Amino acid sequence: MAPIEILKFPISSPGDISPLKKLQDAGYDPSNILAVVGKTEGNGCVNDFSRTLASAVWEPRIPSDAVTIFSGGTEGVLSPHVTFFLRSPGDKETGLSAAVGHTRRFEPHEIGTDEQAQQVATTTSSLIEQMGVTPDQVHMVLIKCPLLTSEKLETIRALGRVPVTTDTYESMARSRYASAVGIAAAVGEIQHTRIPEAVSKAGTWSAKASCSSGAELEDCHILVLASTSAQGSRLHAVSRPMADAMDAASILALMELAKKDGGKIVQVFAKAEADPSGHVREWRHTMNTDSDIHSTRHARAAVGGLIAGLVSDAEIYVSGGAEGQGPSGGGSLCLVYETSI
């Protein structure tokens, strides 16, 4: 278990590494980095190479056992930034702990399948065990997972295998869902034996899963965030799923918990999706039928604007595509805040 600090900084482009200097100015060394989690100004789709660029410039500059998780798409008021998860100097307790890890690399035909979910469940369970926390203490499992490209589909066909889908964009959703099912098993929301059934049909979801797909990796990068019972905690995490893209009440409820503690919000992590039913509550929406803009981009803009307005901060992590990450049409939500000791 690693007690952690969380710091975030704006970036001027996906290749901007100036936050590293700011991190050092704040008294931290790059060796303290557990994870770099960022929002980059791409389209968040299959051909979003802003994620690839960000990963390429950051990974050589952080410890080999650290992870990068970059989510493309800063639609609306969302502002590009990076959030550092840092080992607390001297392992001083802060109230939050984190662990990071990788699954093995996946063969193209395994992406979006129950094998991916099983590997995520195994790795995540191991991280939770290493941390010495209970699933109830876990507030978020953040994952970057692979997707299918045209080249990978050709490889699958050449091997006589069958891909989970032949649509590269849909593969993002299938990979996110498989990862979310794995998380659900790891935190005890479903039994491990139910993974194949859960992956084969929609409907399973985890309140603690936040998964983002990308072409920049072949494995899953995993970050587990948990609260500890340390006395005099300074950092706190609270979480609950949003019921839909208009669920201000859930955000306000978490903000109220921070307010009661006299806390200052450090970061918000949220998933967003266009309700597949075509309605938000009783109102019809057109996010799923827009031929110009993918629904995930609409959802990021809508939920990003809602949360940013409520917390008065545009440097928040809002990721589109919430398959299995909160109820259908909603999404997982985790708020981190800081109190004075």
From Swiss-Prot:
**The keyword Transcription is annotated on this UniProt entry:** no
Pfam families associated with the record: Amido_AtzD_TrzD (PF09663)
- Which GO terms of type biological process are on file? atrazine catabolic process
Stated regulation of activity: Inhibited by barbituric acid.
For the ligand (Mg(2+)), the binding residues are 273, 322, 325-327, 330
Task: Report the InterPro entries cross-referenced here.
Answer: AtzD/Barbiturase, AtzD/Barbiturase_RUA, AtzD/Barbiturase_RUB, AtzD/Barbiturase_RUC
Instruction: List, alphabetically, the Gene3D superfamilies matched.
Output: Cyanuric acid hydrolase/Barbituras, RU C, Cyanuric acid hydrolase/Barbiturase, RU A, Cyanuric acid hydrolase/Barbiturase, RU B
Q: What's written under domain?
A: The monomer structure is formed from three repeating units (RUs) that share the same structure as one another. The monomer, the active site and substrate all possess threefold rotational symmetry, to the extent that the active site possesses three potential Ser-Lys catalytic dyads. It is possible that any or all of the three active-site serines may act as nucleophile (albeit only one can do so per catalytic cycle).
Q: Which NCBIfam families match?
A: amido_AtzD_TrzD
Pathway(s) this gene product operates in, as recorded in its UniProt entry: Xenobiotic degradation; atrazine degradation; biuret from cyanurate: step 1/1
The protein's superkingdom reads Eukaryota
Keyword line = Hydrolase, Magnesium, Metal-binding
Task: Give the residues the record marks as binding substrate.
Answer: 51, 71-72, 176, 212-213, 300, 319-320
Name its species.
Answer: Sarocladium sp
Active-site residues from the entry: 144, 212
Q: Name one GO molecular function term.
A: cyanuric acid amidohydrolase activity
What does the record note on quaternary structure?
A: Homotetramer.
Region annotation RU C: where it falls in the sequence:
235-341
Question: What name does the UniProt record give this protein?
Answer: Cyanuric acid amidohydrolase
User: Which chemical reaction does it catalyze?
Assistant: cyanurate + H2O = 1-carboxybiuret + H(+)
Q: Where is this region: RU B?
A: 95-229
Query: Region labeled RU A — which residues?
Result: 1-90
Please give the family membership noted in the entry. Belongs to the cyclic amide hydrolase (CyAH) family.
